[in-house]
Amino acid sequence: MSPPMSPMKPPKGFAPMSCCWSTETMQKWLPFLGWLPDYTWYALKMDFIAGISVGLTVIPQALAYAEVAGLPPQYGLYSAFMGCFVYFFLGTSRDVTLGPTAIMSLLVSFYTFHEPAYAVLLAFLTGCIQLGMGFLRLGLLLDFISCPVIKGFTSAAAIIIGFGQIKNLLGLQHIPRQFFLQVYYTFHNIGETRVGDAVLGLVCMVLLLVLKLMRDHVPPVHPEMPTGVRLSHGLVWTATTARNALVVSFAALVAYSFQVTGYQPFVLTGKTPEGLPDAHIPPFSVTTANGTISFTEMVQGMGAGLVVVPLMGLLESIAVAKSFASQNNYRINSNQELLALGFTNILGSLFSSYPVTGSFGRTAVNAQSGVCTPAGGLMTGALVLLSLDYLTSLFYYIPKSALAAVIIMAVVPLFDTKIVKTLWRVKRLDLLPLCVTFLLCFWEVQYGILAGTLVSVLILLHSVARPKIQVSEGPMLVLQPASGLHFPAIETLREALLSRALETSPPRSVALDCTHICSIDYTVVLGLGELLEDFHKRGATLALIGLQVPVLRVLLSADLKGVLYFCTLEEAEKYLKQEPGTQPYNGSEDSVPEHKIALLKA
């Protein structure tokens, strides 16, 4: 159910700090000040329901994602609550929930060597980097990671994460974590499958699938429905929304039933420390049996993770925020989202959190529950803290196969098969970065993302260096570049002009239509100067038409000799025919039309 109107009012912009903190400035830095004065009892009720729903989802997921990250289960819960509280103050989306995710947990497992100290330090450094990007407004770096690269990465990650849980689903032991070795040893040791784990895991997967299908097909409730029908609808909706908690509780109950009989056919999660860890600064060194590992050595060990983890965290979080903002008709502030995520990771690291980001699945639960403001996260965070205080003794009985089922069912939607058909229909060349990213991610995630991004940038540069040039015949030959003109493209333009105009007999005059050119650089100016000389030597004319003001300003500053520019093609053709009353604009601002002069001086 969705509320008729939310009191959430995200800020329109992100203003720099000033010495005078006005109310508007305060609301931009602390968005909750904008919607809190208008908070209603209706919003409180809906936020409470949404917070409970998300809390029942995040607790079993957090335990499961800690396994993906290669960390003890309690670290998933340590990572699940701080974002709820920080986002209340700093977030600009009413739907987003921050916490552990499958993708981020996978990245953590690659760069932290399954050592909690490394994971906590990575969270701190990730937060610092994200915070710096937010203050410096460097979110634009994410624009260079194209959609095919993201889809290739998430699809590969879904396979890596999903297959990584087969060992827990089947109760296999001593399986390496490197993907290719994992595949080999999983099939090699398939004969050691524990029947109890396999049966329970498959039953949990079936239950999760059935409950999800029920959730997707529950008809909307209407006020005119009888009370009994609405009550039944609420019960079904609650059960299907909290399906992860329901299925994990069922599995734990089954395991406990066997435990009291003295026979245990399942591999259990085991003892989980009670309570929240004491707040402390992240470890900047680690003492092992072989000696002390310094901060510098820890950072060197993380390597590319200090780039990949912050960027992918930002990308995932902002993608989720933008998706639900568009779906629910409100706006977010991307730079403010960076700050919220950065502060979450920094403060979370004080309580042994590993890096977190926005969760698409839990955000969807939040939105479908009718959340009105980020206040819903307060209830989610409170539930996680309560579970750490009072439920950790019960986590002992949760079978690992049940958590594996939760993870597998959570990552299945990440594998996007439709994107291949869409790209084949829209632009087949975009399949190249998708495939490069997808394949190389099985080797190393950072290589996949880097190679895919590089291929995407090369495709972009190719279109810049080889712009399409439309040619029209007439009294003058008209060449119109279909996009901007920058230094890699000057040789393409030269080749087109030489082959179409100067290498013909006799040489032809050309009008270069600059309608689509909004900027040029110094190399282009030099290239145009050389072309003007070539045309002059062969007794032909090169005229520029449709110049935009920024381009005209650059040409005037360069003081090119012999450059002719006209407002329209008709004026250029009249000048070529030497019809009276037509003169080119060249030489200085004195010859430029009055409306252009006004724009130049504006």
Swiss-Prot record:
Transmembrane domains' residue ranges: 48-68, 70-90, 116-136, 144-164, 194-214, 247-267, 301-321, 338-358, 371-391, 395-415, 439-459
Family annotation (SUPFAM superfamilies): SpoIIaa-like (SSF52091)
An annotated GO BP: chloride transmembrane transport
Domain STAS: 466-580
Subcellular location: Cell membrane; Lysosome membrane; Apical cell membrane; Basolateral cell membrane
The keyword Membrane is annotated on this UniProt entry: yes
Keyword Transmembrane helix set for record: yes
Molecular function terms from GO: chloride channel activity; chloride:bicarbonate antiporter activity; monoatomic anion transmembrane transporter activity; secondary active sulfate transmembrane transporter activity; sulfate transmembrane transporter activity
Record-linked InterPro entries: S04_transporter_CS (IPR018045), SLC26A/SulP_dom (IPR011547), SLC26A/SulP_fam (IPR001902), STAS_dom (IPR002645), STAS_dom_sf (IPR036513)
GO (cellular component) term, any one: Golgi apparatus
Catalytic activity, reaction form: hydrogencarbonate(in) + chloride(out) = hydrogencarbonate(out) + chloride(in); sulfate(in) + H(+)(in) = sulfate(out) + H(+)(out); oxalate(in) + chloride(out) = oxalate(out) + chloride(in)
Alphabetical keyword list: Anion exchange, Cell membrane, Ion transport, Lysosome, Membrane, Transmembrane, Transmembrane helix, Transport
Membrane association type: Multi-pass membrane protein
Extracellular membrane side: 1-47, 91-115, 165-193, 268-300, 359-370, 416-438
Pfam families reported in the protein's UniProt record: STAS, Sulfate_transp
Principal subcellular localization: membrane
Residue spans, topological domain Cytoplasmic: 69, 137-143, 215-246, 322-337, 392-394, 460-602
UniProt family annotation: Belongs to the SLC26A/SulP transporter (TC 2.A.53) family.
Function: Sodium-independent anion exchanger mediating bicarbonate, chloride, sulfate and oxalate transport. Exhibits sodium-independent sulfate anion transporter activity that may cooperate with SLC26A2 to mediate DIDS-sensitive sulfate uptake into high endothelial venules endothelial cells (HEVEC). In the kidney, mediates chloride-bicarbonate exchange, facilitating V-ATPase-mediated acid secretion. May function as a chloride channel, playing an important role in moderating chloride homeostasis and neuronal activity in the cerebellum.
Protein name stated in the entry: Sodium-independent sulfate anion transporter
Organism annotation: Bos taurus
